[in-house]
Amino acid sequence: LILAFQFTEYAGTMREIGLLVLLAISTFFIHELGHVVFGIVAGYQFHFLTAGPITIERNRITANSSWAYFGGIASCSPKTDDLQKISRQHFLFAAGGPILSIVVAILSLTVGYFFNLQYVQFLGVMNFVIFLVTAIPFKGEFKSDGRVMLELLSKGNEKEQFLSTLLLIKEMMSPALPNMWSLHLVQQARTAPVNEDNITV
């Protein structure tokens, strides 16, 4: 009986942990989905969305093969070469994640409170935390969504270099062979200083 009680208690703890992990993955997915939806509405081409163990591509769903992407990543690229248009499009793409996160946070916290649903409230708290972490402008190993939006609203070499990087990604994602890529963009990539901002977007 003692062993059965201990097993039951352990199983309950594992169930709680499993539910929290599922809520965390759902939170990552919601945030990245916001990027994708706003990106597509803005005119971007969708490539893939990864959250937790799953990767969603345009025509299939596969297992995520990279732990680096477990926390979520959304890949979309511009269809145009117009830098002003790309600037507006990428601003919406960057804003989409935090916007959907805060909307889901408010809805989850409200529904969870009025119907006394603890896990729905947890989902709301997690989405609110993701909103704060991504909306506040900062630059560490990666730029936050807020930092990207701030740069896109500014003027100068940093913004131009960032937009050129987006154009180069567009070339890389296209069916065109490397020898058909824009020589101007390739030259810009060669002369750009080596740092995290110029190897990740």
Q: PLM features: residue spans?
A:
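Topogenic membrane-insertion module of multi-pass membrane proteins
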Residues: 1-20
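Solenoid-like repeat scaffolds
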Residues: 187-196
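Membrane-interface elements of multi-pass transporters and channels
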Residues: 7-11, 37-49, 111-118, 139-143
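Small-residue-rich helix-interface/hinge motifs
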Residues: 17-81
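Generic helix N-cap/helix-start motif at coil->alpha-helix transitions
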Residues: 161-164, 195-201
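Helix-turn-helix repeat elements of alpha-solenoid scaffolds
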Residues: 171-187
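Hydrophobic transmembrane alpha-helical segments that form the core helix bundle
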Residues: 82-172
